[in-house]
Every structure is written in structure tokens, then in C-alpha cells.
Regions:
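Flexible loop/turn connectors
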Residues: 229-336
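Short acidic capping loops at alpha-helix termini that bridge into adjacent secondary structure
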Residues: 177-178, 209-213, 262-268
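Alpha-helical recognition/docking segments in bacterial nutrient-uptake
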Residues: 3-4, 34, 53, 57-173, ...
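N-terminal helix-turn-helix DNA-binding module of bacterial transcription factors
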Residues: 1-60, 336
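Hinge/beta->alpha junction and helix N-cap segments in small-molecule ligand-binding domains
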Residues: 66-76, 94-103, 146, 156-166, ...
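Short gly/ser/thr-rich secondary-structure transition/capping motifs
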Residues: 42-48, 102, 122-124, 253
């Protein structure tokens, strides 16, 4: 038979109130904490988080819903967040919705049934009705990377518009004018922001935006391959291309190799994220680097502030845009 809190109380000689306070994160004297932890180990006691959640309305679990678990950007953020949340006694349930709106809705519904204390979401669905339903529980939501109209919640974003603007300006300052872009899905917030930055940089330099130099991809490796091939085929005058996420950057490099294009002699390129991949390329790839560590820390901090400082909540929504950085390689040629 499994050990109970009463068994721990008998073993330690402490009252049930003290034992309960320990398990619910309350203040317990150090000598009592040691007694309780020794008894837990001796009795092989396991906390029934679901049962405790029914009593306290807190399960000390956080739901995380992301579009692609094998996406480097997502994976690095999850790792950083989990480390911080775990250090505060919270576990995470990670749901990979595979960039599928239906799977995302199902994931949020599943997490709601599991009575998670909050949800961290990098959203795919731009309507967010499933998130609105979760908000009715009174529990917090923190959005990463993308905002949803009509959802009043905290968000930690990257300044994607400026990221793209900086990358395109980097080309322009080195003499490039025929600059292509491999963008993301047109309906995705980050893709819209990056496309807006691309257009703004060109317009600020007096360079007309040409539709033939724009490829709307799908944030996949294969999308990067197709985008590179289409842009090169349709734009023989193109001297540079900006690829707007890591997976498509990998795909674009595959496309370059398959077509026998020399970087940067025949085509200059700026990619997105993953410094290790950029360093492995020959020549080393110039990239836009997103602050994944900073995003992870901010998201965890905002969520923990909701869960652990409820009495101090100001009622104001938190929204922050973090800056990206261009890490120069040798993939951009200076034109005479």
C-alpha cells in the first residue's frame, strides 16, 4: 500500500498541518524539513499531483505548446525555460502541435483538463478561441514570438521587423540592390513582421520592392530549397538573398550546393539563427541571431511572477520586444 501524509506525520512526529505546508511550498523549519524529506525517502512516498491539484487548484505544472519540437529556436527556448521553472518546483508538459491549428487547439484543451497552472504558447492559430476559453479559468497565458488580436495576455517577442530591416540594410551597405527574401507563411505574425522589415529597408534606400524577389515559404527545410531554386531561376540579376528562419536557411544552403552556386562570389546570403550551423558552413554564414536565452528567461520570469506573486500583481499586461544581433561571417560579398 502506498504511503500517505499520515504515515509521514507518524514517522516524523510532526502534525499534518506542517506536512501539508511542506508539500504546498509553505514555510517549514529547517529541522522539520530534514525530518520530512528523510521520511519521504524511507517510505518511498510519491505526491499525487492530480489529487493535490483538486484540493489546492494548483498542480505545479506548466503547459507549453509550440509549433515544432524539432525547430532549433523552439527547442532552445524550451530547454532554458524548463531549467528555470524546475528550479522553482514546476514541471512542464510540452505539446508539439506540428504547426497544425487543430492540434494546437487539442493541446490547449488537453492541458486545461490536466489543470495546468498556466500555459506558455508560441501560437499557430491566429484566432485563439481555445486560449480565450483557457483564460476563463483565471490562469495565466504567456505568448512567445507572436501576438494574437483579441487575446489580452503577456507576451515576449523578438523585434522581427527590425531584425529583417537590419539584415537587408547590411546587404545594401555593401552595394547590393537586387535582394531576394525567402519568407515564412503569409498568415504567420513573425513572417509578416520580417517581410515588413525587408520592405522598409528597401524603401528607405530608394530601392523598389519587386514581387519576383519575394518567396513565401513554410519555415521548413524543403521550403528553403524550393525558395532558393525559384528565386535563382526567376531572378538572374539577384546578388543577395535573406532567409528568414533556421530550417529554411538549411534548405537554402542545400539548394545552393545542388545548383553549384558559389557563396559569396555568385550569391551573397544572410541566414537566421543557429550559430553552430553557421560556423559549419563554408564559407561561414552571416546570420541574424535571436536571443533564445533571453526569451527563455523573460517568459519563465513572467509566468513565475503570476504564479508566485499573485498578491503583488499590478493588473498591467507585460510585453517586451527583444533585439536580435547580426553575427558576421563571410557569406556577404562587397560589390564595387
Amino acid at each position: 500500500m502506498a504511503a500517505t501524509m499520515k504515515d509521514i506525520a507518524r514517522r516524523t512526529g510532526l502534525g499534518l498541518a506542517t506536512i501539508s505546508s511542506y508539500f504546498n511550498g509553505g514555510n517549514v523549519r529547517e529541522k522539520n524539513r530534514i525530518k520530512i524529506e528523510e521520511a519521504i525517502e524511507e517510505l518511498h512516498y510519491e505526491v499525487n499531483e492530480v489529487a493535490r491539484g483538486l484540493k489546492t487548484n494548483a498542480t505545479r505544472t506548466i503547459g507549453v505548446v509550440i509549433p515544432e519540437l524539432n525547430n532549433t529556436f523552439c527547442a532552445e527556448i524550451i530547454t532554458g525555460m524548463e531549467d528555470i521553472l524546475r528550479s522553482h518546483g514546476y514541471a512542464t508538459i510540452v505539446c508539439d502541435c506540428r504547426t497544425d491549428k487543430k492540434l494546437e487547439r487539442e493541446a490547449v484543451e488537453f492541458l486545461t483538463r490536466r489543470r495546468v497552472d498556466g500555459i506558455i504558447n508560441m501560437p499557430v492559430d491566429e484566432e485563439g478561441n481555445h486560449l480565450k476559453r483557457f483564460q476563463k479559468t483565471g490562469k495565466p497565458i504567456v505568448l512567445i514570438d507572436r501576438k494574437i488580436q483579441g487575446i489580452n495576455c503577456d507576451s515576449v517577442l523578438v523585434d522581427n521587423k527590425k531584425a529583417a530591416e537590419d539584415a537587408v540594410r547590411y546587404f545594401i551597405e555593401r552595394g547590393h540592390r537586387n535582394i531576394g527574401i525567402i519568407g515564412g507563411p503569409e498568415e504567420v505574425f513573425t513572417a509578416q513582421e520580417r517581410m515588413a522589415g525587408y520592405s522598409k529597408a528597401l524603401e528607405s534606400a530608394g530601392i523598389p520592392v519587386s514581387e519576383s524577389l519575394i518567396w513565401h515559404g513554410d519555415y521548413t527545410i524543403q521550403g528553403g530549397v524550393r525558395g532558393l531554386e525559384e528565386l535563382v531561376q526567376n531572378n538572374p540579376e539577384m546578388t543577395a538573398v535573406f532567409v528568414t528562419n533556421y530550417e529554411m536557411t538549411m534548405g537554402a544552403m542545400i539548394g545552393v550546393n545542388e545548383l553549384g552556386i558559389r557563396i559569396p562570389e555568385q550569391l551573397s546570403m544572410i541566414g537566421f539563427d543557429n550559430l553552430q550551423f553557421a560556423r559549419a558552413c563554408n564559407p561561414k554564414l552571416t546570420i541574424v541571431a535571436q536571443p533564445t536565452d533571453g526569451i527563455a528567461k523573460e517568459v519563465a520570469k513572467v509566468m513565475l511572477n503570476h504564479l508566485e506573486n499573485t498578491g503583488e500583481a499590478s493588473g498591467e499586461l507585460f510585453s517586451e520586444k527583444l533585439e536580435t544581433e547580426i553575427i558576421a561571417g563571410k557569406s556577404v560579398r562587397v560589390l564595387a
